[in-house]
Amino acid sequence: MYGLEMLEKIKLEYDKWACLTPKNSLYDRTLVWLFLSLLMIGFIMVTSASIPVSTRLNNDPFHFAIRDSIYLACSLLAFAFVVKIPMRNWEKYNVPLFLLSLLFLASVLIFGRSVNGSIRWIQLGPINFQPAELSKLAIICYFSSFYVRKYDEMRNRSASVIRPMVILFLFSSLLLLQPDLGSVVVLFVLTFTMLFIMGAKVMQFLLLIVTASVSFILLVLTSEYRLKRVTSFLDPFADAYGDGFQLSNAQMAFGQGQLWGQGLGNSVQKLEYLPEAHTDFVMAVVAEEFGFIGIIFMVVLLLCLSFRAIKISRDALKLEARFRGFFAFGVAIWVFLQGSVNLGVASGALPTKGLTFPLVSYGGSSLVIMSVAIAILLRIDYENRLTRVGHAQIKEP
């Protein structure tokens, strides 16, 4: 009986949702379909790309696929829970989230688990949690609240950018000790673009960009590990069996895909030639199995998701809901930047960074946190629509 009641409730909710047109719907259907499409594609590609390595490591071709399905279920549960949380709660508790993220980043240096020479994960029972993913969400939440409180000051006083820079330096220092330069790049771009939309002065913005660029160059030149990554990126085939092994095989995957690809499951490079085929380099497998058309399709999905987030941000700012607007803009930049960098790395256009493709690459932390970010976007859009309805009712005679 309980099961029948649950099914009946689900049917009623679906009927209510289905009878609404996109114009009067309380949720952005396009955003939901984009989210679900990327999750579905991600599960299919992780399953395809992970079969060889899963068979070798665990004698089970679907070991990583099963784990990914668990992460997928957790992501959907997190999505369903977070979409119910009012945005005022995120604004109210932005500091505790910020401090929690900082604590996790510090803890990973003490209790962290080393994988491929980097200490980026904390063992939490059967799962590995990557605090760097939480830090991106925490930075967006904290800066959105900070910019709301300091909006006028940010536009008139040069000293107002000092606190964001100090916070960015603190997070970046902890991330570089792991080391995780990719996440540092994401945080830098997030901070600068949010400063830009806040109306920071042009000279401030240019000074920050120059400072960041010089810092990045120094970080590369003073680290043999990072320098090797850059030099191997410039010519991966010069040391195809050494530092350039991963990039050279990724580029071969792109080349073999040609226009239409080899077909789902027919990738050669995933047969233990391409390391991390189901994580950071899953887009190389997409390119080999679905070709140039497949990559274009993924880019279109990424752009649609990013532009949808920007539209939600613009709508919120028009309604004078600055926290919601800044938050949505931060998520838009995060999604677009991380997807672009991942694709650039996989295609050989950028040095390897260790960043996942949003909602597609294998990785529980990335999948759950990104799903939470999309749920917040949906919540922002929902509150925007409620605000517009309220304004319309007030204007009625």
UniProtKB/Swiss-Prot annotation:
Pathway: Cell wall biogenesis; peptidoglycan biosynthesis. The chain crosses the membrane at residues 31-51, 62-82, 95-115, 127-146, 159-179, 180-200, 202-222, 281-301, 326-346, 357-377. Its main location: membrane. It is an enzyme of class 2 (transferase). GO terms for molecular function: lipid-linked peptidoglycan transporter activity; peptidoglycan glycosyltransferase activity. Residues 1-30, 83-94, 147-158, 201, 302-325, 378-397 are cytoplasmic. Residues 52-61, 116-126, 223-280, 347-356 are periplasmic. It is found in: Cell inner membrane. It catalyses: [GlcNAc-(1->4)-Mur2Ac(oyl-L-Ala-gamma-D-Glu-L-Lys-D-Ala-D-Ala)](n)-di-trans,octa-cis-undecaprenyl diphosphate + beta-D-GlcNAc-(1->4)-Mur2Ac(oyl-L-Ala-gamma-D-Glu-L-Lys-D-Ala-D-Ala)-di-trans,octa-cis-undecaprenyl diphosphate = [GlcNAc-(1->4)-Mur2Ac(oyl-L-Ala-gamma-D-Glu-L-Lys-D-Ala-D-Ala)](n+1)-di-trans,octa-cis-undecaprenyl diphosphate + di-trans,octa-cis-undecaprenyl diphosphate + H(+). One of its GO terms (cellular component) is plasma membrane. It is a multi-pass membrane protein. It comes from the Bacteria. Keywords: Cell cycle, Cell division, Cell inner membrane, Cell membrane, Cell shape, Cell wall biogenesis/degradation, Glycosyltransferase, Membrane, Peptidoglycan synthesis, Transferase, Transmembrane, Transmembrane helix. Its EC number is 2.4.99.28. One of its GO terms (biological process) is regulation of cell shape. InterPro entries: Cell_cycle_FtsW-rel_CS (IPR018365), FtsW (IPR013437), FtsW/RodA (IPR001182). Peptidoglycan polymerase that is essential for cell division. NCBIfam families: ftsW (TIGR02614). Belongs to the SEDS family. FtsW subfamily. This is Probable peptidoglycan glycosyltransferase FtsW. It comes from Haemophilus ducreyi (strain 35000HP / ATCC 700724).
